[in-house]
């Protein structure tokens, strides 16, 4: 139920609530998988939220996303079985101008609530 290029940052509470519930359930699934396998399951959160054009208000979508993430991660789970990660979005088709989940946004999020922060590094290997 992605709408207008947004999920957790969408102004429509119904859209946000759908993705909040999805996030909560994915955490429980990851914890279950960790318990069943006896290994820590990494649950990576990546949201595609963004806009093609420069918005006047960059703060409000990020505020909505932060509140949604706080709700998703409210319940503490056993890190022996699952650890959460957030992954920033650089840009994408349809979101060239503004990305809600920027690198800086997720660095702040990870420092206060999340176990891991995924750094996407691109390495170019020259083939001979």
Where are these regions (language model features)?
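Active-site acidic/histidine proton-transfer and metal-coordination neighborhood
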Residues: 2-113
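Catalytic alpha/beta core domains of metabolic enzymes, predominantly
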Residues: 116-128
